[in-house]
Amino acid sequence: MGMTASNAIATFFKYFVLILVGLIMIYPLLWMISATFKDNSEIFAGIGLWIKNPTLEGYRNALNNFGGSINILQAMLNTYSYVLPKVICTVVSSCIAAYGFGRFDFPGRKILFSIMLATLFLPQVVLNVPQFLLYTKFGWVNSPFYLAIWVHCAFATETYFVYQLVQFMRNVPRDLDEAAAIDGCSSFQTLYKVIVPMLMPDLVSCALFQFMWSCNDFMGPLLYVQTPAKYPMSLFVKLSMDGDTGFAWNRILALSLISILPQLIVFFCAQDQFVEGISAGAVKG
């Protein structure tokens, strides 16, 4: 049966709104890409995408060393040398903690879970001073392995992901646990042989969130990394902004674009599982 006029109009407006919102969301990224090929005068002349006098000076300057101590490649290697361990530790520890809260009944479970959730209301700035003092005593500040930035994630300190995975586990039938126990599986065998494969889209979504948040983190490296040669991309971009003599915005935008490319690639490669994981978490809360 053909589409009626009212349905056609409704469909047109629906897609029109979606396309309009999509353009509004993506326009800043498109402008940033075009601005990397402009000089300062053209960048501040307007917000259009058209490039009158294209130049690669921004990318050439972005690849130069700053003070001879670090370049963009080293900064990216520094970034992922703590981002990857942080993501792995977060996913593993949060999954184990969520498994304990979501599948077992033990004395004080609800109280402990409530206390854990209460930590979500603590601003990170409140924790910065005690954490800095503690990590200083441990000798982790300015550690070559960035221990102060990621080691705590091995102890399920990322409450948001624990809570998120608990919600996901509520969608997994408990009959599977009983069937695994009948087959002789221990609790940990049930976790990684039965639960984890079913939670893979949810784990991917948690990993993506942590990956993007860690790559964009500025305060953590600012507190715990004190040697310019160890700076990650977030501090490297700030290092390239000389407030005394002024700076070329095409270089800053080129650095920013290069820094987010790995995040975009990872997101687009895992977007199907990411959407599936987010949708699964919304089924039951």
How should each PLM-predicted stretch be described?
Residues 3-285:
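A structural signal for multi-pass alpha-helical bundles of membrane permease subunits
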